[in-house]
A protein has these predicted regions:
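Conserved acetyl-CoA-binding loop of GNAT-fold acetyltransferases
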Residues: 124-133
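Conserved acetyl-CoA-binding loop-helix of GNAT-fold acetyltransferases
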Residues: 79, 85-98, 121, 125
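Extreme N-terminal starter segment of soluble prokaryotic enzymes
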Residues: 1-3
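Acetyl-CoA-dependent GNAT
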Residues: 5-70, 75, 80, 93-95, ...
């Protein structure tokens, strides 16, 4: 398995993975978002490639804050449904942690939906613990 930067040629596979995560987007929208992230140096988008196929996707970014130390946040992590349990997710999270350490950050945080129990079990297995419960509030315009 290879963990590497997401390339434009990977966007069709990334679109499929995001759909598996529950985000039905068209490839043009994923491409536009990827291009915006490329311009943001505090963001990292990686893929896991296995036998020439993209089977995992990670987006992590550095989040500065006034009220707490700056930390890395995993915005998205998804492994192809056919490859879950094979170490792909752990490899991507290890990449996120190495990136955070290299930037001098002291922690990696992530948010996971309350109903995603298999994801909760995965994160606990790799050393993460629940640090709180919150509600997402949004106002669209």
């Amino acid at each position: 398995m290879i963990v590497r930067d997401l390339q434009p040629a990977d966007l069709p596979a990334a679109t499929i993975l995001l759909d598996q995560l529950g985000y039905a987007l068209d490839e043009a929208e994923v491409r536009a978002r990827f291009e915006r992230l490329l311009a943001a140096p505090a963001h990292r988008v990686q893929v896991a490639e296995l036998d020439g196929q993209v089977v995992g996707l990670l987006h992590v970014f550095e989040r500065p804050a006034l009220e707490k130390p700056c930390e890395a946040v995993v915005q998205s992590l998804v492994v192809d449904a056919n490859c879950r349990g094979s170490g792909v997710g752990a490899a991507l999270m290890a990449d996120a942690e190495a990136w955070a350490r290299a930037r001098g950050l002291l922690s990696v945080a992530l948010y996971t939906g309350v109903s995603r129990e298999p994801a909760h079990a995965f994160y606990k297995r790799i050393g993460y613990a629940q640090a709180g419960t919150s509600h997402l509030m949004r106002r669209s315009f």
